[in-house]
């Protein structure tokens, strides 16, 4: 379960926060426009997150990976954005 203090740390300047509750977070990167859905499978703590990703709103989500905390998942997303923008240069 996501704690409120973890949810409050999501950077609203970096992400468009679509949904953020105790079990699920849906955000959109303002840098790439990609959508991310984070599901907390750990109860009662956030020790097991599944990260889903899609490139456009109309696309289907695909599983991107796992994380042990919301903070770790956010770091992974920022790293993926950096890769998309600076290595692949496809955006």
Place the predicted regions along the sequence by residue.
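Short aromatic-glycine-(Arg/Gly/Cys) micro-motifs in beta-strand/loop hairpins
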Residues: 31-62
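Negatively charged, low-complexity tracts enriched in Asp/Glu with abundant Ser/Thr
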Residues: 1-33, 56-60
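Solvent-exposed, non-transmembrane amphipathic alpha-helical segments
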Residues: 27, 35-37, 87-90
């Amino acid at each position: 379960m996501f704690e409120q203090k973890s949810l409050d740390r999501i950077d609203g300047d970096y992400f468009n926060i679509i949904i953020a509750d105790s079990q699920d977070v849906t955000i959109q990167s303002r840098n790439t426009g990609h959508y991310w859905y984070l599901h907390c499978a750990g109860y009662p703590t956030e020790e097991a997150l599944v990260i889903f990703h899609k490139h456009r709103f109309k696309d289907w989500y695909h599983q991107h990976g796992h994380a042990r905390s919301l903070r770790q998942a956010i770091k992974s997303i920022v790293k993926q954005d950096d890769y998309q923008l600076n290595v692949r240069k496809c955006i």
